Amino acid sequence: NLLIVLTSSLVVLIFPKIMGVTEYSYWQLYIFYLTYIGFFHLGWIDGIYLKYGGLEYTNLDRKQFYSQMILFSSFLMLISLVLFTLNLITVRDENARYIYNMAIISMIVTNLRTLYVYILQMTNRLKDSSVILISDRVLYVLLLFMFIVFGWHEYKVMIWADILGRTFSLMLSFWICKDIVFQSLSKFILDFKESLDNIRVGINLMLSNIASSMIIGIVRMGIQWNWNIETFGKVSLTLSISNLLMTFINAIGLVIFPLIKRTKTENLPKIYSNLRNALMLVMFAILLFYYPLKFILDIWLPAYKDALVFMALIFPMSVYEGKMALVINTYLKAMRMEKDILKINALVMLTSMVVTLVTTLLLNNL
């Protein structure tokens, strides 16, 4: 997980330096769309994660999970066909069409890979799930540096590096979960009831995750629509720097979830207090790094200096978002209170939407 944060740091800090602002901004637009590709599984994967979290891998019903894999893969292909068609018909801008198409390809690969990662994480095979995720980012960074050596700095090259990394990690997940993936078709069960139940269980968590990402996403959409692609890219860089810490915190939350699921109810309050106190101490200590980091980035990335001033507002948000992601959300998911998560995130998302409309349409002020 730390390695994933380090590779993300390299991309965030080095590539804005060597790419033009416009090229980097298109790359950030692609990354922005990737934030919402999880919407298209409709909570199917989240339902599996919630229903079977805490079980041992050896106790999983291989035939049932194999059947769900086939049905889920078919569903993704159908969704992607519809999206490709809509993109071809409705989008006229060449760059936007290319980015949409690549995001659709990434949607198929990433959602299918997430199914296997969740299976490993919910059964506490954390080392294997980490290997899958690390392999993606390591290959991605290696390809990017190879492209730098050859002088290829276009955003399209970066997108291909990202998709190749994700595809490699998907192939690796096939191998790690081969006892589920590689079975005879005769074992396939057309069990729509199980699929719909997984969606029913997981859709609240999926919607809450989407609503959570839309809190900042709506702001970014407002910037994209009201200003130019360069402004969008500069603000996105600032958000990416602040989100590096959240990447690590979310990874820790995935580790804690199966442990909490197996913990006795009477022990949960004490564990909650200890986690909360430890996290707050660390998060507030990290805020001390704001001023030296801002000073270094102003020198390193002068083209983005006018956007880096927003770090003063965004950086402290990581404290509260970290507490929500690591402590509160993890506990609510373990206690099957996904509807409460959805209500909270939906309310904040609506607030973000209203404020964004006011600041973009009425005030026209970043």
What are the language-model segments listed below?
Residues N1-I4, L29-Y30, L34-I89, Y98, ...:
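Membrane-water interface segments that mark the loop-to-transmembrane alpha-helix transition
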Residues D46, Y66-D93, M171, I249, ...:
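Alpha-helical transmembrane segments of multi-pass membrane transport and lipid-handling proteins
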Residues I48, V117-M122, L126, F145-G151, ...:
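C-terminal transmembrane helix end/exit motif
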Residues H41-Y57, S242-E266, L275-A278, I328-A334:
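Helix-loop junctions and terminal segments of transmembrane helices
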Residues K127, Y155-D162, M171-I216, V255, ...:
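Interhelical loop/hinge segments that connect adjacent transmembrane helices in multipass membrane
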